[in-house]
Amino acid sequence: MKFFVPAFLFAATAMALPGSGSAAGVAPHSNNEVEDAVNKCGDGAHMSCCNKINKNEGISQNNIGVLSNVLGAIGSEGLGLGQGCTQLDIPISVLGAAGLTDFLKKNCQQNIACCQNSNSQANGNLVGVAAPCVSFGGLL
């Protein structure tokens, strides 16, 4: 009995301690939110600097229907759609953790967004939503 209590306490303590790595198959989360947003932009889009971000434009909490409040539920401020966006050409040399943040601060004083590479049109698709540029605030 004397051996069981310390062994049980040791095992309980070891199980309660946080792990040092990430779970199998799950990538560890980076501390740099800008770098995370760039990774979320993906291959089918590019980073852009937008003059204006319209947050929750045309979306109200009183909408009724199957898809009501879907866009308003994305992020704390909803989905931000960019207007007047120009593509940012990011050199490979700045892709480090601190280099990317500094590059964006120097080259974009407005809003950073993720824009689709193709022209976005809402005509003829099932949902009828065209979101060419989405602010990083809606992605994080």
From Swiss-Prot:
Task: Give me the disulphide-bonded residues.
Answer: 41-114, 49-108, 50-85, 115-133
> According to the record, what happens upon gene knockout?
Affects hydrophobicity only when HfbD, HfbE and HfbF are also deleted. Disruption of all 7 hydrophobins leads to altered germination kinetics, decreased survival under exposure to extreme cold stress and increased mycotoxins patulin and citrinin production.
* Family listed: Belongs to the fungal hydrophobin family.
Q: Which InterPro entries match?
A: Hydrophobin
What protein is this chain from? Class I hydrophobin C
Quote one Gene Ontology molecular function term.
structural constituent of cell wall
Q: Which UniProt keywords apply?
A: Cell wall, Disulfide bond, Secreted, Signal
Quote the subcellular location field of this record: Secreted; Secreted, Cell wall
Q: Which residues form the signal peptide?
A: 1-23
The record's Gene Ontology cellular component field reads:
extracellular region; fungal-type cell wall
Chain's role: Aerial growth, conidiation, and dispersal of filamentous fungi in the environment rely upon a capability of their secreting small amphipathic proteins called hydrophobins (HPBs) with low sequence identity. Class I can self-assemble into an outermost layer of rodlet bundles on aerial cell surfaces, conferring cellular hydrophobicity that supports fungal growth, development and dispersal; whereas Class II form highly ordered films at water-air interfaces through intermolecular interactions but contribute nothing to the rodlet structure.
